[in-house]
Amino acid sequence: MIPTLALVGRPNVGKSTLFNRLTRSRDAIVANFSGLTRDRQYGEATHGDKRFIVVDTGGISGEEEGIDSYMAGQSLQAIEEADMVAFIVDARVGLTAADMQIAQHLRTCNKPIFLLANKVDGVNESIVCAPFFELGLGDVIGIAAAHGRNINTMLDTVLENVEPEAEASEEDKAKGIKLAIVGRPNVGKSTLVNRMLGEDRVVVYDMPGTTRDSIYIEYERDGKAYTIIDTAGVRRRKNIKLSVEKFSIVKTLQAIDDANVVILVMDAQEGIVDQDLHLMGHVIDSGRALVVALNKWDNLDNDHKSYVKTELSRRLQFVDFADLHFISALHGTGVGDLYKSVHKAYSSATEKLNTNFLTKILEFAVSQHQPPLVNGRRIKLRYAHAGGQNPPIIVIHGNQTAAVPKNYVRYLEKIFRKELELHGTPIRFEFKSSENPFAGRKNAMSKKPEHPSRRANSGGKSINRRPRPKS
């Protein structure tokens, strides 16, 4: 399970700067959810082969009324949800009473605490870090978040006991497709989970997942195995009212990362809101297959339906690869159709791609529309091969590949998606500049390549297309 690192500290010690550094200056993936304290940001970061969620807790201000004023409400919850805590102090300001109060609270959390002294650039690091040993939190790691100083060393320490992401085991595969049902509060996630489990389900067992409060529910439908990652709390303890849907951003992000396919539920009555788009952005960043379900569709009149469809076509162009379903989870309308899209997306995301066919598609794409010139020289794209699954990663080798513009990458994605018949999954491209392995041979690009779909009639070896998934 992808771990969570909470950034904690007084205002202006550099939490947001470090957050942007770790997430490569991307905006918060999820922001401004109702019920969250100001300025809390959530993002995903990588260090080598390790991935983790970063939380900029915010909301720690003032020094007069004790720890409750610094870490009220959602900030305390973020620390509670986190697997690790980075306590950031200002090396230039030095140790303050507020730092000592925060440290006193953190010592009771029973979590790994890492003390980071920020802003050590231009000063004697050992001298400015020395006072913070008084906090009793162990070693002090000096960093300069604004300039990236010691960030990699700090991450080596923080992530030392975090395991790299592992491939799915045979045991996990036997449990079937993992579905994460995600969405804003009160869009109908609980109702959809119950409807998908249905009266004809075969529930093997319900067990708490390693994600706090998420439940992994194994079941069968039409002889096929599935595991729903339930973040909505439909099976919580009886003393928690089911009408009050708990919402945890960390829990949602972890569910997305652990899933094979994500069903994003939206409320048709409210239309598309920014929070929906933020969640979609995280699904794409995570490389997960996506199915979009617009719930409560039966509550709309025809004029409202027409307006919502227009808005969908306008605002969801960046996820036009995902199937869109209009459903009523309460009455079951359209819910069964979700499974066909789930299988189609899962098959596309996990299909093994043939190197020969990928190179033929690349040759065809280049013949139809060549890459641009860079400094008077044409970018050369020579061959392609698969680099991974879930999402499909296509590695393209050539010359000057670092200069391939984004609009040409979008063109390549369109061609590869069409020829590979990939539905419901993002595609990743990796470009590598390298020596041509076919040097000395006749360049296959010197003659106009035929369309990949006509390969079977070319006299060469046919490359079978991926079989279409059965619904």
Swiss-Prot record:
Domain named EngA-type G: residues: 3-166, 177-350
Q: Which PROSITE patterns match?
A: G_ENGA
Q: What are the alphabetically sorted keywords of the record?
A: GTP-binding, Nucleotide-binding, Repeat, Ribosome biogenesis
- The answer to whether the entry has keyword Phosphoprotein is no
Q: Which domain of life is it from?
A: Bacteria
Family annotation (Pfam families):
KH_dom-like, MMR_HSR1
One GO molecular function term?
GTP binding
- UniProt-annotated stretches for the region Disordered: 432-471
- Which PANTHER family would you find in this protein's record? GTPASE DER
Query: What assembly does the database describe for this protein?
Result: Associates with the 50S ribosomal subunit.
The record's NCBIfam families line, in alphabetical order, gives: GTPase_EngA (TIGR03594), small_GTP (TIGR00231)
Give the protein name, as stated in the record: GTPase Der
Gene it is expressed from: der
